[in-house]
From Swiss-Prot:
Record's subunit section: Monomer. Interacts with integrins; the interaction promotes cell adhesion.
Disulphide-bonded residues: none
Organism: Sus scrofa
Region described as Disordered: 41-258
Modified-residue entries (Phosphoserine), positions: S46, S51, S59, S60, S82, S90, S139, S266, S293
Compositionally biased intervals (Basic and acidic residues): 125-136
Domain of life: Eukaryota
Motif stretch (Integrin-binding motif): 272-274
Residue spans of biased composition, Polar residues class: 93-102, 161-173, 193-202, 229-243
Signal peptide extent: none
Alphabetized InterPro entries for the sequence: IBSP
Protein name: Integrin-binding sialoprotein
GO CC annotations on file: extracellular region
Length: 300
């Protein structure tokens, strides 16, 4: 079986020309632009404005949710120490969400995710008072729907935090499972982040940013050299095979140079480093025919 069968393409017009199949390579980079299928569009990475985060109109809804969440945090005042922990919370959210947030089509785009979150979090700290008036102007139906969504998200976060409370990557699992990107409820995230701060942020600082291992020595855990294995089972370096098997097996690397590799096969007696039998067979296959798999006179 050869690749020749893939190069055959029957023409529909005249069957006489079909009798001899021509070699027509497929062009994967086309000459003209209109032959291409429509390409997948990716979101443009922009740090200027948060409304251009996704390239489509989703960011306005995300901003409304962020306003809602920030105002509800002010009204509830569940975390009195939220001002002290706000920087650490935002850092932890940026770290975890930028690694686990999926971009368009399942591809991880950490740059856009972190930039979008930073741009969405800046107004939460700066201009809360202006957003209260903006929130009062919103319709009551939108507020009720968003409150229901936030309650559901907070319940999901609490359940996941109950299961993953002790593991070091609990906030990563939360942000990966529950939500996508900027749509997560700030309340649920702040609760989970403050609960898991003792584990997650400390674990990240101890590891030096390496989240895969739990070693406290900074960075990834180095694999120790297998001392006992090299001490017990490996043979000494001079021998290649153990003396029991010397009769059965052929020793390959025992001598410095093996004269069996010097083979004078060609007529001129030129030495070759190794026997070229496979190459000679392939070359003799291509003798008398051209390398494109159909010579002109083969079929006449």
């Amino acid at each position: 079986f050869s690749m020749k069968n893939f190069h055959r393409r029957a023409k529909l017009e005249d069957p006489e020309e079909n009798g001899v199949f021509k070699y027509r390579p497929r062009y994967y980079l086309y000459k003209h632009a209109y032959f291409y299928p429509p390409l997948k569009r990716f979101p443009v990475q922009s740090s200027s404005d948060s409304s251009e985060e996704n390239g489509n109109g989703d960011s306005s809804e995300e901003e409304e949710e962020e306003e809602e969440n920030s105002n509800e945090e002010e009204n509830n005042e569940e975390n009195e120490d939220s001002d002290g922990n706000e920087d650490e919370d935002s850092e932890a959210e940026n770290i975890t969400l930028s690694t686990t947030t999926l971009g368009y089509g399942g591809d991880v785009t950490p740059g856009t995710a972190s930039i979008g979150l930073a741009a969405l979090q800046l107004p939460k700290k700066a201009g809360d008072i202006g957003k209260k008036s903006a929130k009062e102007e919103e319709s009551d139906e939108d507020e009720e729907e968003e409150e229901e969504n936030e309650e559901n998200e907070a319940e999901v976060d609490d359940n996941e935090q109950g299961t993953n409370g002790t593991s070091t990557n609990s906030t990563e699992v939360d942000s990966g499972n529950g939500h996508s990107g900027g749509d997560n409820g700030e309340e649920g995230d702040q609760e989970s982040v403050t609960e898991a701060q003792g584990t997650t942020v400390a674990g990240e600082q101890d590891n030096g940013g390496a989240k895969t291992t739990t070693s406290p020595n900074g960075g990834l855990e180095p694999t120790p050299p297998p001392q006992d294995i090299s001490g017990t089972t490996l043979p000494p370096s001079g021998k290649t095979t153990t003396p029991e098997y010397e009769g059965e097996y052929e020793q390959t690397g025992a001598h410095e140079y093996d004269n069996g590799y010097e083979i004078y096969e060609s007529e001129n007696g030129e030495p070759r480093g190794d026997s070229y039998r496979a190459y000679e067979d392939e070359y003799s296959y291509y003798k008398g025919r051209s390398y494109n798999s159909y010579g002109g006179h083969d079929y006449y």
